[in-house]
From Swiss-Prot:
Domain of life: Eukaryota
Segments of this protein annotated with the region H3-like: 104-207
PTM statement from Swiss-Prot or TrEMBL: Ubiquitinated. Is degraded through ubiquitin-mediated proteolysis when not protected by its association to the kinetochore.
Spans annotated as Disordered: 1-63
Keyword terms of this UniProt record: Centromere, Chromosome, DNA-binding, Nucleosome core, Nucleus, Ubl conjugation
Gene, per the UniProt record: CSE4
Subcellular location: Nucleus; Chromosome, Centromere
Protein name as catalogued: Histone H3-like centromeric protein CSE4
PROSITE patterns assigned to the protein according to its UniProt record, in alphabetical order: HISTONE_H3_2
Species assigned in the record: Candida albicans (strain SC5314 / ATCC MYA-2876)
Taxonomic lineage from the root: Eukaryota, Fungi, Dikarya, Ascomycota, Saccharomycotina
Known partners and oligomeric status: Component of centromeric nucleosomes, where DNA is wrapped around a histone octamer core. The octamer contains two molecules each of H2A, H2B, CSE4/CENPA and H4 assembled in one CSE4-H4 heterotetramer and two H2A-H2B heterodimers. Interacts with the inner kinetochore.
Length: 211
């Protein structure tokens, strides 16, 4: 019985050592595979970097300055280069010069066809509803007229909204008056409006005082 138990214990210890050796071998193989994979990745990265550098600088520097000049037409001394007189012996490249422009001749301005700018201004004014008279000069004119009527001792003061309302009404009146004046000029087979056209338009409107 003692002999059998010793044999069984020896088998168990032998099996344990063999399993441990197999585990160590597997671990070593795994480490080797990881190391090879890392080396492959590093090699690929270096190759990509080298390819990127070659793409960024496609011109490969030559060994000497004379060979650089013969290949690429450049001459540049670098540390260790032999100074030669190749560049001085070769003729210089001539640059093409632009013809001189005579500055004394005035530049001709672009001329539009008659009526083009007028139609552009008409479209611009028809699209907008902004005030066409400057606000400050109009306000000064309103204050001046009011002072002429009531005198400076009265102390008349104006609100900005009141002056704005007067300006809106004044511009609307002038626009409609000029529209009627233009119709009177067209009726007279003319293009230019005159004072008599304004007088006729105001007389047709029934306004008593005439310009």
């Amino acid at each position: 019985m003692a002999r059998l138990s010793g044999q069984s214990s020896g088998r168990q210890t032998g099996q344990g050592t063999s399993a441990e050796a197999i585990r160590q071998q597997r671990e070593e193989l795994r480490r080797q595979r990881e190391l090879r994979l890392q080396q492959q990745q590093q090699a690929e990265r270096q190759q990509q970097r080298q390819q990127y550098r070659t793409e960024q600088s496609p011109i490969v520097p030559a060994a000497t300055s004379s060979s650089r000049y013969s290949q690429f037409g450049i001459y540049r001394n670098q540390p260790g280069d032999v100074v030669d007189t190749l560049a001085s012996s070769l003729p210089r490249r001539t640059t093409t010069t632009r013809p001189e422009v005579n500055r004394t001749v005035p530049r001709v301005k672009k001329r539009y066809r008659p009526g083009t700018k007028a139609l552009r201004e008409i479209r611009q004014y028809q699209k907008s509803t902004d005030l066409l008279i400057r606000k400050l000069p109009f306000a000064r004119l309103v204050r001046e007229i009011s002072l002429d009527f009531v005198g400076p001792s009265y102390g008349l003061r104006w609100q900005s909204n009141a002056i704005l309302a007067l300006q809106e009404a004044s511009e609307s009146f002038l626009i409609h008056l000029l529209e009627d004046t233009n119709l009177c000029a067209i009726h007279a087979k003319r293009v230019t409006i005159m004072q008599k056209d304004i007088q006729l338009a105001r007389r047709i409107r029934g306004q008593s005082w005439i310009l």
